[in-house]
Amino acid sequence: MDQQPGPVQQSSPPNLTNPRFTLELEFVSSLANPYYLSHLAVTYPNLLGISKSGDEGETSNESSDPEAKAFAAYLAYLYSYWKTPEYAQFLTHPGATLRALRLLQEETFRRDIIRPQVIEALAGTGVDEQGAQDTQEGEGEQKQNKEEDAQDAQENTESKT
């Protein structure tokens, strides 16, 4: 009865000898690279809710694709605990990694990362995501607030070391 409700199922503390922990650490660390995000979008468009037919009008693709829903839930699960200082301390690039995980929570971003302009904007901006905001309509302020949250998590991690 000590179980807490919610998506976080990672109850044990982070341990580098735990295969699941190291696998997830490697995966979330890879997300810091915008070109890896591009690779995911091109190679596995179904996971990100991207239409293979190229129809721009299809916006409900994710809701009809169980793989996209499952992957979105997995990304939410990863973000829920990697943003905590206990786990973020293991990230080599916490700002970029948490930014990518946060952005991947948004269906529009998952759908738009197949566009080269979005990837180039992410690659050219580092921690500041102004370029990525230009590619998203009306979500700039929300993204900026979330970026500040990621920076706070990074500062918390740095203060513990």
From Swiss-Prot:
GO terms for biological process: regulation of DNA-templated transcription. It is found in: Nucleus. Residues 124-161 are annotated as: Disordered. It comes from the Eukaryota. Gene3D superfamilies: Mediator of RNA polymerase II, submodule Med31 (Soh1). Keywords: Activator, Nucleus, Transcription, Transcription regulation. GO terms for cellular component: mediator complex. One of its GO terms (molecular function) is transcription coregulator activity. Belongs to the Mediator complex subunit 31 family. Component of the Mediator complex, a coactivator involved in the regulated transcription of nearly all RNA polymerase II-dependent genes. Mediator functions as a bridge to convey information from gene-specific regulatory proteins to the basal RNA polymerase II transcription machinery. Mediator is recruited to promoters by direct interactions with regulatory proteins and serves as a scaffold for the assembly of a functional preinitiation complex with RNA polymerase II and the general transcription factors. Component of the Mediator complex. This is Mediator of RNA polymerase II transcription subunit 31. It comes from Aspergillus clavatus (strain ATCC 1007 / CBS 513.65 / DSM 816 / NCTC 3887 / NRRL 1 / QM 1276 / 107). The lineage of its organism: Eukaryota, Fungi, Dikarya, Ascomycota, Pezizomycotina. The gene is soh1.
